[in-house]
Amino acid sequence: MDEKTIKKSILSSSNDEKIIYKSRIKKFQKNHKFYIILLVFIAILQFISIAFFTRGFLLSRHVLDNISSQNETSKLPPRFNKAVILVIDALRFDFAIPVNESHSNYNLNYHNNILSLYDSFASDKDASSLLLKFIADPPTTTLQRLKGLTTGSLPTFIDAGSNFDGTVIEEDNFLKQLHLANKTVKFAGDDTWMALFHPFLSNDSFPLESLNVWDLDTVDNGVMDYFHDHLQQDKEWDVMIGHMLGIDHVGHKYGPDHFTMREKQIQVDQFIDWILKSIDDDTLLVILGDHGMDHTGNHGGDSIDELESTLFLYSKKPDMWRLKETSNYNIDNLGHDYRSVRQIDLVSSLALLMGQPIPFNNLGWPIDEIARNDREWSQFVNSAISQLQLYKDTMQIHHGNDEILEPLAKNISNTPPTSDPEKFVKLGHKYQKVFLQTCEELWAKFDYYSIATGITLLATSLVLLISITKLIPSIVVNQMVPEFVPGIIIMVLVTNLCFHGIFYVYQQPSFVDQFWGTLLATAIGIIIGCYITIFDRYNFIWIAMRLGETLADYWSRIAVMFMIIHALLFTSNSFTIWEDRIVAFLLSTFGMLTLYEFVFLPKRQSTTALLTATISEKEGTTSGVNPSTANSNYLPLTRFARLLGGYHSAVLIIFTRLASMITICREEQGEYCIPTFNNQNNSSWWVLGLCFLMIFILPACITGYYNLTSSYQAAAPIWINVFLKGILGLNFVYWSLTSLENNSAVIAIPFLRDVTIFKFTLARIIAGFSLIASNVGWLMGPLCIKLNIHNTDVKSHEATILGYTNIYGSEFFLLVINVLISILLFNKPLAQLSYFLMCNQLLSILEIIDLLKLKENIIGPIALGLLSYQHFFTTGHQATIPSVQWDIGFMLSEKVTFPFTQIAIILNTFGPHILVSLSVALLTLWSQPPDVLKPQTLLGRIVSNCGILLTYNTILCLSSFIWVTHFRRHLMVWKIFCPRFIFASLSLIVTQLVVTFGTIAFASGRLIKHINDIFWK
């Protein structure tokens, strides 16, 4: 008898056992499919609730398609027949004025490099130049700024989400007016203009890819070449527009404090100087920034640095502007007291200067300095007031401010512009300010029906999740799953039939159309279908008593306390902005409590797992636990187990603290937060050195955890010591090349000047292997076990299966490694160090949960949930728009390419949530041999732990819904509470998708069946 025969005989079973197994596995496969369908229905219910709430809360203003005409606004002769408009993206105001080198905030890289504008203004003796501070209205994303600059209207928060999906602006705007007047508008630069205005632009325009922030020169060089070719030689244009992106892209890629910013600003300054000399006397030159940038180079929020940009008007004709007193243009202290105008004021100003009607939806006010005398100024004001009053009358706007507006309008009509121009101007400006405030308040109206529907549906889904995944025993849910699915399908059909029948017979409610009615009917059908099945077996009293029993033990109460504390953070803006610190504190608290448990309370016997085991032994196998293992759960921890548990607790505490040192700060945190996650540190050699060490340390750490259960066998060495180490090495090469690009000392080396092609190739190789090849290998690869024959006599059957006690967990974690290496590619070096710490924290939590017999306790999923939120913050993110790392989207392609750009940004932003959503199954599978739990019981417990993680994220999402609604009139609602609710919604969606389709549908079902096929258990 050879060794192969011995192995086969050890794993063989009788025919009766095989028949029983086949019946069991067939039932398992059937229930597995039903579980997936049930979770999909619950996910649909939650997605519908999020959709309703988002519809009701995220505002969108009503836009009229009216177009202004010269008959509606007073006809004024044009002062200029041609205009050159140059938009310099992210031209912060202090970039364009002289800054004293002794100033505390002076920086060589971004100050005193663009002096053409101020020099022209300061040396101007004949009033041909005008330089102003230009204040943007948040959000400061480029698309929203272009809308404001061309229509004169205010953006809403929901517009920020369309920055990458611009569609043609149908409302009246400055470019449409030029088009209607048969003016030729030529354009070069940011292709966002083509997305928004292509019907109004010349076919000779030259749009360029705008979203690739890694490319600093292509757009700028294209604009400069286009202007050199067309500005003087080509006479067939009336307005020429250029939009340069280099300064903005340098900010996104490196931050403002980088030598490349100085180079780019000098290039822009030279180009401006050339334009000043090249335009003719009849051309108006407008140079402006659409927004600024913060200290990290980002924008999108409403900090001062993000809102303050630059506006420069110039003509070679003298006496074009009527300047105010010199004190209004004080550049001291970075221009803190310098005169400013709002961006919405530009539209009416340009329209009046070019002799065009003011766009219909404009809410701005002409810039004071554009009028050369009082008479002309009163004419401008008269045109502006006529347009505003026409807009108000057409919109039929009524508000509490009418008692102010109506007397003002009457006084204006009774005050002829020619007789008392000063009074007329004052009345007109006051009218505009009050009307603008009125529109801002009116556009802040919420759809309370949709908000209430969203909150109600999400709260109901929370109750369903808790009932199905925790209150009802998993072994009973196994029996009920085949009843849930048909019940839900039938009720969804019935409710849709009823809803649409009612809508057909009776008038449809005003707050819900046919599409939203279908969604609501579907949600109600899912709820009714679930509750019919539940209450067919149980009642409210039993469920309430079961809830009390579940929360009776120590660790469950700790878990609930953590959830409540986290959910209550959203009750205050002060708590919300410090969420990163609070989450780290809660995770450290869990580590301290487990350390106390191992050191001082080794004989604790009151965990839910022990009680379940006891019940299983006394009452049979109701919970699915093998009775032979029940007594082992009663045994106190051995000395070695206590030492091991103490070690893992210490690792969790220390690594949580180390991870919290990687910070990206919110503006509201002020001086109390020192950012460490920045471009300088991510490109530093010490961080790259740590990443190099991680190539060897991370595989060694994972190997150590595997050796605890003798699981470092077969597939494990290949995955951990070859694949993981190899990908980490390639990853290190990629980010080292990126660091070289940031280093002025080495960038001059010829062969290092352009490594873009090599980086793209390397990134695609890593992504292809980690996203596709490694997962195919996992599906087809061997288990992490080895048959060890003790006796040299091959006729002896004495053998040990190494890795048997952790056969599920060791194999499943290889899939986690696949996902980890996928995520690491799309994260910057400091974030990769955070993931190294996270991996060790994750494995320590799994060991702690196993040692304390807490596999069925809710503390496990909650601890993993806290881990995901901590590392969301430590990988360079906050719940704000500016913290989204858009530049990562261009690691695989030079332009926005579906789906590669989206995959990169999702893996970068939600990597920790994806890892935890996949790893939550390990709470059940880690150190779980095949002979303890039946396949169905094992799957039921995995679903239970996944359900608790979903419950945690649902509670956070529900809390954010409630409190963002409560604070809807709060000063910080759009800056703090609204972004947090969006992040909570997206986190829940990502968790639902990964848990349902990744953890349950793909990984767990396949692994359980595969292992049971081998061992016939």
Curated annotation (Swiss-Prot):
Stated consequence of mutating D887G: In MCP1-4; impairs growth at 36 degrees Celsius
GO cellular-component term (any): endoplasmic reticulum
Glycosylation sites: N66, N71, N100, N182, N203, N411, N681, N682, N707, N742
Transmembrane segments: 34-54, 347-367, 457-477, 484-504, 515-535, 558-578, 582-602, 644-664, 685-705, 715-735, 765-785, 806-826, 829-849, 903-923, 947-967, 981-1001
Protein's UniProt keywords contain Transmembrane helix: yes
Pathway the protein takes part in: Glycolipid biosynthesis; glycosylphosphatidylinositol-anchor biosynthesis
GO molecular function annotation: mannose-ethanolamine phosphotransferase activity; transferase activity, transferring phosphorus-containing groups
Enzyme class: transferase
Result when mutating S556P: In MCP1-4; impairs growth at 36 degrees Celsius
Keywords assigned by UniProt, alphabetized: Cell wall biogenesis/degradation, Endoplasmic reticulum, Glycoprotein, GPI-anchor biosynthesis, Membrane, Transferase, Transmembrane, Transmembrane helix
PTM note: Glycosylated.
Topology of this chain in the membrane: Multi-pass membrane protein
Domain of life: Eukaryota
EC number: 2.-.-.-
Major subcellular site: endoplasmic reticulum
Family statement drawn from the similarity comment of this UniProt entry: Belongs to the PIGG/PIGN/PIGO family. PIGO subfamily.
The name this protein goes by in its record: GPI ethanolamine phosphate transferase 3
Organism annotation: Saccharomyces cerevisiae (strain ATCC 204508 / S288c)
Designated gene of the protein: GPI13
